Amino acid sequence: LWKT
C-alpha cells in the first residue's frame, strides 16, 4: 500500500 502506497501513501503518496
Swiss-Prot record:
Keywords: Calcium channel impairing toxin, Ion channel impairing toxin, Secreted, Toxin. The keyword Transcription does not apply. GO terms for molecular function: calcium channel regulator activity; toxin activity. It comes from the Eukaryota. The keyword Secreted applies. Signal peptide: none annotated. GO terms for cellular component: extracellular region. Coiled coil: none annotated. Expressed by the venom gland. It is found in: Secreted. Specific inhibitor of store-operated non-voltage-gated calcium channels. This is Tetrapandin-2. The lineage of its organism: Eukaryota, Metazoa, Ecdysozoa, Arthropoda, Chelicerata.
